[in-house]
């Protein structure tokens, strides 16, 4: 099982490859207290476990955004270097290291090409699958040499005419340098002008542009088809055939995507994820093809006009232009499938190796798991991977070395392991120096892995390289040389919901001079969608917390003095021990879980309370035993973490009342956890009377909105007359 977010070793993982629920970590602390009681008639108790597979117009909006404002100070300060100093620095390291051996390619049926270099011992080990040679540079293949215009006697003709109104041109090439400088200065000083609007489809849009004292901020009109998008002709046919009309949320976001503005989309669902993935693939491939087309045109022009003094700036320091950050290998497969669907290469090199190592069949035992769980963990759910894609005129190559790649797809863990190696001499992030489009898909899933890896990668984007890597500095765009690439780069982040960590990307890493937009849904509230046949009392208790750093202590004090004292009194004073049990305590944070677990084990207040505690670190047998004891009444209380529920989606039986130490980040979890009250049909009425009690503070504003609804959350955060709110 994965370690907690931002905890563990140097490269702590999310959910890794291998047996689900297995871990070598054992808690050396008392994690439960068992009470011997007379068993009731639970003839099917064990069967329930053994057959289950292991596995901002609103008034409060400003307050919500302030939750992540402290992270602004963490932004990496980057110092621009003078042009001459940069040239001298890089030329020192420009000594050739000798070309790698050119690989002979063998044609296979189906138009696929595969490397003819055999793997050691006849099989690929983990190092090969991860691509330990990702940073090695190779000579171009025969096909690439033929495709290069220099070898074509300077003859190169494009199938597209240049358009001065093309966002690709206006954003990267035809930029007024004085205006760009003003916008960059405003972005550096965090001076943004914004507008907020709620549109009829149930979305809240916040658009911001650098404040240079000109004009007002307005929203762009919806984009309903590709006819107004400046696409390469090669893409237009497949795009319009696959997506004849842009609908839903995508029509409101597409203008900003194709306009090269930063996008934070917080309404990702299993139903709209495929459409969004296709639109992003069209945009990514369009950017790659236009970048390549511009370079080839200028190469041809230089070959024809060798005596002319041409100043053609069309490149970055290195080749990779698009970076995908994805949670699992199967998510990578889906992204690549979208890319190939629109690029339609005549040949795909190493495709079989890619499918063999990245794709897998879904687990059939998960048919009863929630849809979002099956989407995230279906197929190959390994979170340790990286992949380079290289595009030529007719071919797409998988597993290309990063410095020869156009698109890099990776998990945060997989990419960081190659960037931040133990040997300082092997550390390298120059391949990220010229990334112009970053796509972070399913950011909430990455949050449940190790968010520190995401921050590390983003902090190392668009830094000036330490080596030249064969760069022609006379062709490098001036804003690269001025160390301003991060203000031109486009970042697109999609998430099922927005947390303070994800929200901080909007304020810290989204600095696009063209502007940025944040899209969030208007929430009806998870409390209105509880899957129970009877109404259940849902009580929310607010406690005072001065700062986010003091919030854990304030929460713990409120829980032990107010909630737990009442809970212990009810358990110990009840004559019927079986009815006294059944209390599930749901704890979002693992650190809070450890603190509460230790308190239950050592405090005199809970001496007479039998309890169990299971988290994402618990072994399967520990979890099974604790759930069985809880269901049989031997545990009166069960402590249960949000990350364990994220990775397992257990159905906990025997629940008669629920205490939420904090509301869950994922609003779907509210209905699933409260639904535990109805798993025993005979006791559902009694369980509904036990109800749910949840603790919250002002720093829970973002996730509280998802639980109680957009219309209710403002009053609950500001209410002066009381701190308890009950919904039935």
From Swiss-Prot:
InterPro entries for this protein: P-loop_NTPase (IPR027417), UTP25 (IPR010678), UTP25_C (IPR053939), UTP25_NTPase-like (IPR053940)
Family note: Belongs to the UTP25 family.
Pfam family, one: UTP25_NTPase-like
Main localization of the protein described in the UniProt heading: nucleus
Compartments (UniProt record): Nucleus, Nucleolus
GO molecular function: rRNA binding; U3 snoRNA binding
GO cellular component: nucleolus; small-subunit processome
Biased composition regions of type Basic and acidic residues, renumbered to the chain: 33-54, 107-116, 147-157
Species annotation: Neosartorya fischeri (strain ATCC 1020 / DSM 3700 / CBS 544.65 / FGSC A1164 / JCM 1740 / NRRL 181 / WB 181)
Signal sequence, start to end: none
Residue numbers spanned by region Disordered: 1-172
Superkingdom: Eukaryota
Keyword Nucleus carried by entry: yes
UniProt function note: DEAD-box RNA helicase-like protein required for pre-18S rRNA processing, specifically at sites A0, A1, and A2.
Skewed-composition ranges (Acidic residues): 67-76, 122-146
Biased composition (Polar residues): 22-32
Compositionally biased spans, kind Basic residues: 7-18
Gene Ontology biological process terms from the UniProt entry: maturation of SSU-rRNA from tricistronic rRNA transcript (SSU-rRNA, 5.8S rRNA, LSU-rRNA)
Keyword presence, Ribonucleoprotein: yes
Keywords on record: Nucleus, Ribonucleoprotein, Ribosome biogenesis, rRNA processing
Gene: utp25
Protein name in UniProt: U3 small nucleolar RNA-associated protein 25
Disulfide bonds: none
Record text on subunit structure and interactions: Component of the ribosomal small subunit (SSU) processome composed of at least 40 protein subunits and snoRNA U3.
């Amino acid at each position: 099982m994965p370690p907690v977010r931002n905890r563990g070793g140097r490269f702590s993982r999310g959910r890794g490859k291998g047996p689900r629920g297995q871990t070598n970590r054992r808690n050396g602390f008392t994690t439960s207290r068992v009470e011997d009681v007379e068993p009731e008639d639970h003839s099917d108790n064990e069967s329930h476990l053994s057959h289950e597979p292991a596995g901002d117009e609103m008034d409060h909006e400003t307050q919500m955004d302030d939750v992540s404002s402290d992270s602004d100070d963490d932004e990496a300060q980057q110092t621009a270097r003078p042009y001459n100093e940069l040239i001298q620095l890089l030329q020192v390291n420009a000594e050739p290291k000798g070309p790698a051996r050119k690989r002979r390619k063998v044609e296979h049926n189906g138009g696929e090409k595969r490397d003819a270099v055999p793997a050691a011992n006849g099989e690929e080990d983990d190092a090969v699958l991860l691509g330990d040679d990702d940073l090695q540079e190779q000579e171009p293949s025969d096909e690439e040499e033929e495709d290069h215009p220099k070898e074509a006697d300077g003859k190169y003709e494009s199938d597209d005419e240049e358009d001065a109104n093309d966002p690709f041109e206006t954003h990267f090439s035809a930029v007024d340098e004085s205006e760009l400088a003003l916008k960059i200065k405003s972005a550096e000083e965090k001076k943004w002008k914004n507008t907020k609007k709620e549109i009829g489809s149930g979305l809240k849009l916040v658009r911001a542009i650098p404040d240079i004292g000109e004009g007002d901020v307005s929203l762009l009109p919806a984009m309903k088809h590709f006819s107004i998008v400046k696409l390469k002709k090669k893409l237009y046919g497949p795009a319009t055939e696959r997506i004849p009309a842009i609908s839903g949320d995508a029509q409101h976001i597409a203008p900003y995507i194709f306009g090269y503005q930063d996008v934070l989309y917080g309404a990702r669902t299993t139903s709209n994820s495929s459409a969004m993935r296709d639109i992003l693939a069209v945009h990514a491939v369009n950017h790659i093809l236009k970048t390549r087309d511009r370079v080839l045109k200028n190469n041809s022009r230089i070959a024809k006009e060798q005596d002319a003094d041409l100043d053609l700036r069309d490149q970055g320091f290195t080749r990779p232009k698009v970076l995908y950050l994805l949670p699992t290998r199967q998510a990578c497969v889906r992204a690549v499938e979208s890319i190939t669907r629109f690029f339609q290469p005549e040949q795909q090199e190493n495709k079989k190796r890619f499918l063999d190592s990245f794709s897998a069949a879904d687990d059939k035992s998960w048919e009863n798991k929630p849809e979002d769980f099956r989407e995230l963990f279906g197929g190959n759910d390994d979170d340790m991977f990286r992949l380079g894609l290289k595009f030529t005129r007719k071919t797409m190559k998988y597993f290309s070395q990063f410095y020869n790649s156009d698109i890099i797809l990776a998990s945060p863990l997989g990419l960081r392991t190659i960037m931040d190696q133990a040997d300082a001499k092997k550390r390298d992030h120059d391949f990220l120096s010229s990334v112009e489009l970053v796509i972070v898909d399913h950011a909430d899933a990455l949050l449940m892995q190790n968010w520190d890896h995401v921050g590390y990668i983003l902090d190392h984007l668009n830094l000036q390289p330490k080596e030249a890597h064969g760069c022609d500095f006379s062709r490098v765009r001036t804003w690269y040389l001025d160390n301003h690439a991060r203000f031109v780069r486009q970042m697109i982040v999609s998430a099922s919901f927005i947390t303070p960590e994800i929200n901080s990307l909007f304020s810290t890493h989204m600095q696009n001079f063209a502007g940025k937009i944040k899209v969030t849904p208007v929430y009806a509230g998870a409390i209105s969608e509880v899957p129970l046949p009877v109404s259940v009392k849902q009580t929310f208790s607010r406690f005072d917390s001065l700062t986010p750093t003091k919030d854990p202590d304030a929460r713990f004090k409120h829980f032990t003095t107010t909630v737990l004292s009442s809970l212990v009194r009810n358990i110990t004073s009840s004559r019927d021990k079986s009815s006294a049990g059944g209390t599930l305590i749901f704890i979002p944070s693992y650190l809070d879980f450890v603190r509460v677990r230790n308190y239950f084990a050592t405090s005199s207040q809970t001496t007479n309370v039998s309890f169990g505690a299971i988290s994402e670190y618990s072994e399967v047998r520990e979890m099974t035993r604790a759930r069985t004891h809880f269901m049989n009444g031997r545990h009166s209380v069960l402590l249960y973490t949000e990350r364990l529920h994220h990775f397992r989606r257990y159905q906990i039986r025997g629940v008669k009342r629920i205490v939420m130490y904090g509301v869950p980040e994922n609003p779907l979890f509210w209905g699933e956890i409260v639904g535990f009250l109805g798993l025993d049909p005979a006791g559902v009425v009694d369980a509904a009377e036990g109800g749910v009690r949840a603790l919250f503070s002002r720093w829970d504003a973002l996730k509280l909105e998802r639980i109680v609804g957009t219309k209710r959350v403002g009053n609950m955060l500001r209410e002066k007359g009381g701190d308890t709110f009950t919904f039935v």
